[in-house]
Amino acid sequence: MYICPMYSKELLKGTLSTILLTLLDEKGRMYGYEITQAVKERTDGKILLKEGSLYPALHKLEAEGFLSTEEEFIGKRPRIYYRLTATGKAQSRIRVDELFQFFETLQQVLLPQPGLHYGTAG
């Protein structure tokens, strides 16, 4: 998948597509290596995407109609650029909103509530 020495894989599972959609929404178009470097830079090296998880995720998003691709030759080597479709832009915003709502819900469960005493009998 992708490695992160600070967080468990289970904690990060399911966020890769949201990360990819968000980056592409911000940058317009990017190629694979550029995406890995942007994630590494923005997370101060806490999340390192591996090709084995990046490209399957990009292909899945493309199959779902969220991404389009264009090939450009750099010298003799082809480079595939990924760009959000209109549906992908909408999906990016939906997923980010959903993730933030989930964070708020987690806080309600995880943060101490005034007047509640956990682990004690009434």
Residue ranges and their predicted role:
Residues 74-96:
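Basic, amphipathic "hinge/linker" alpha-helix immediately C-terminal to the N-terminal HTH DNA-binding motif
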Residues 22, 37, 56, 93, ...:
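A cross-family signal for key residues in well-ordered alpha-helices
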Residues 10-53:
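N-terminal helix-turn-helix DNA-binding core of bacterial DNA-binding proteins
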Residues 65:
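Glycine-centered, phosphate/nucleic-acid-interacting loop/turn motifs that mediate DNA/RNA or nucleotide
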Residues 69:
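Short beta-strand "wing" residues that participate in macromolecule-binding interfaces
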Residues 2-3, 90-122:
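Amphipathic alpha-helical dimerization/coiled-coil segments
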Residues 54-61:
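Basic amphipathic alpha-helical segments that dock to polyanions
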Residues 1-9:
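Short, Lys/Arg-enriched N-terminal segment that forms or immediately precedes the first helix
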